[in-house]
């Protein structure tokens, strides 16, 4: 069995050959003035076949890119979710990893169904974990948001009172 890097190398070799062939076809499509034979002219059907082949190639690459991007985002979300559960001391739910956390109307994650009640003895001190849990909820909400760049939240210093700044508009 060949390694993944060997397979990728073979793919790029095949892509190089395909682009070489595309270059040759392009040169045939745009012949130099009088040096080409009369039969070298492309028909509309042949040009359309080439256009369709190049378009399919681009579409296929875009599809592959989307699949990889979705898988990568899902892996990042799963890793962050697992880290949040580990940091908060709550066991990771046993449900399918493909299911994302559910949002409630306020945009904050609902508590996991397998989480122990707050009054149980397995919950650590009341001072530390709630702050971590609050930060984790905001982070997961931002990651699960469909428009990832519109609602990014800076969670550093969350819970701290920011220093008050007064602006003096009376200065000339």
Swiss-Prot record:
- Which residues fall in a compositionally biased region of kind Pro residues? 110-119
Question: GO biological process: any one?
Answer: chromatin organization
Task: Please verify whether the record's keywords include Nucleus.
Answer: yes
Give the subcellular location.
Answer: Nucleus
**Gene Ontology annotations for the cellular component aspect, listed alphabetically:** MLL1 complex; NURF complex
Keywords of the record: Chromatin regulator, DNA-binding, Nucleus, Phosphoprotein
Q: Which SUPFAM superfamilies match?
A: Homeodomain-like
Asked if the record carries the keyword Transferase, the reply is no
Top-rank taxon: Eukaryota
Residue stretches of biased makeup (Low complexity): 120-130
Molecular function as annotated in GO: DNA binding
**Location of the region described as Disordered in the Swiss-Prot/TrEMBL record:** 87-172
Q: Which Gene3D superfamilies match?
A: 1.20.58.1880
Q: Subunit notes for this chain?
A: Component of some MLL1/MLL complex, at least composed of the core components KMT2A/MLL1, ASH2L, HCFC1/HCF1, WDR5 and RBBP5, as well as the facultative components BACC1, CHD8, E2F6, HSP70, INO80C, KANSL1, LAS1L, MAX, MCRS1, MGA, MYST1/MOF, PELP1, PHF20, PRP31, RING2, RUVB1/TIP49A, RUVB2/TIP49B, SENP3, TAF1, TAF4, TAF6, TAF7, TAF9 and TEX10. Component of the nucleosome-remodeling factor (NURF) complex.
Q: What does this protein do?
A: Component of chromatin complexes such as the MLL1/MLL and NURF complexes.
What is the name of this protein? BPTF-associated chromatin complex component 1
Q: What is the organism of origin for this protein?
A: Bos taurus
Q: What is the lineage of its organism?
A: Eukaryota, Metazoa, Chordata, Craniata, Vertebrata
């Amino acid at each position: 069995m060949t390694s993944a890097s060997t397979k990728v190398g073979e793919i790029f070799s095949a892509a190089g050959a395909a682009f070489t062939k595309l270059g040759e076809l392009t040169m045939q499509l745009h012949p130099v003035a009088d040096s080409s034979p009369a039969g070298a002219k492309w028909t509309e059907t042949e040009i359309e076949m080439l256009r369709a082949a190049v378009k399919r190639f681009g579409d296929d690459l875009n599809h592959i890119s989307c699949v990889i991007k979705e898988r990568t985002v899902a892996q990042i979300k799963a890793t962050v979710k697992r880290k949040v559960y580990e940091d908060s001391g709550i066991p990771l739910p046993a449900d399918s990893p493909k299911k994302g956390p559910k949002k409630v109307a306020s945009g904050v994650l609902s508590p996991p169904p397998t989480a122990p009640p707050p009054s149980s003895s397995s919950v650590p001190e009341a001072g530390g974990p709630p702050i971590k849990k609050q930060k984790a909820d905001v982070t997961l909400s931002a990651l699960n948001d469909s428009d990832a760049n519109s609602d990014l939240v800076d969670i550093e210093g969350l819970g701290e009172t920011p220093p008050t700044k007064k602006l003096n508009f009376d200065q000339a």
